[in-house]
């Protein structure tokens, strides 16, 4: 009876190792797909700053000037931010940068451009300051 239990134990042990290897493979595939989604989502948001599914098509319909180039916010990433696994992986490995750090960098760039006299807003959330009318 001990031989039978030992065989069963070895069989289960082998099965467990196989399942762990399969899980690692699936995790790698999932991570790869999520990174691809992150990259493609960023490209979509940058290329369609005049109108997209996230912000809407108001500026596209109104025929806004194509010279204005709006930078998207990291909060606009509907697909990437919906995956808790991907966010954990990014935080662990630092891959793709920290989202808060990326937001801060974009804010710094926007404020530097405004200081240089460029009044063009850098994102859909920022608006140029209104000048008070002097009579």
UniProtKB/Swiss-Prot annotation:
- What InterPro entries does the annotation carry? Eaf6
* Family under the similarity heading: Belongs to the EAF6 family.
Q: Which Gene Ontology cellular component annotation is one that this UniProt entry carries?
A: nucleus
Q: Where in the cell is it found?
A: Nucleus
Q: What does this protein do?
A: Component of the NuA4 histone acetyltransferase complex which is involved in transcriptional activation of selected genes principally by acetylation of nucleosomal histone H4 and H2A. The NuA4 complex is also involved in DNA repair.
Q: Point out the coiled-coil segments of this chain.
A: 1-42
Query: Is Secreted tagged as a keyword?
Result: no
The record's region (Disordered) falls at 92-135
User: What do we know about how this protein assembles, alone or with others?
Assistant: Component of the NuA4 histone acetyltransferase complex.
| Name by which UniProt lists this protein | Chromatin modification-related protein EAF6
Say which species the protein is native to. Answer: Yarrowia lipolytica (strain CLIB 122 / E 150) (Yeast)
> Which key words are in the record?
Chromatin regulator, Coiled coil, DNA damage, DNA repair, Nucleus, Transcription, Transcription regulation
Enumerate the Gene Ontology biological process terms.
chromatin organization; DNA repair
């Amino acid at each position: 009876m001990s031989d039978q239990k030992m065989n069963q134990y070895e069989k289960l042990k082998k099965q467990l190792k196989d399942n762990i290897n399969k899980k690692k493979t699936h995790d790698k595939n999932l991570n790869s797909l999520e990174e691809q989604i992150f990259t493609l989502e960023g490209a979509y948001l940058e290329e369609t700053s005049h109108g997209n599914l996230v912000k809407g098509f108001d500026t596209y319909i109104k025929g806004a000037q194509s010279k204005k180039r709006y930078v998207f916010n990291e909060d606009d990433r509907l697909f990437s931010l919906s995956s808790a696994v991907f966010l954990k992986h990014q935080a662990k490995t630092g891959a793709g940068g920290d989202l808060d750090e990326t937001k801060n960098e974009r804010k710094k760039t926007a404020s530097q451009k405004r200081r240089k006299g460029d009044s063009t807003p850098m994102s859909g959330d920022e608006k140029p300051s209104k000048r008070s009318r002097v009579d």
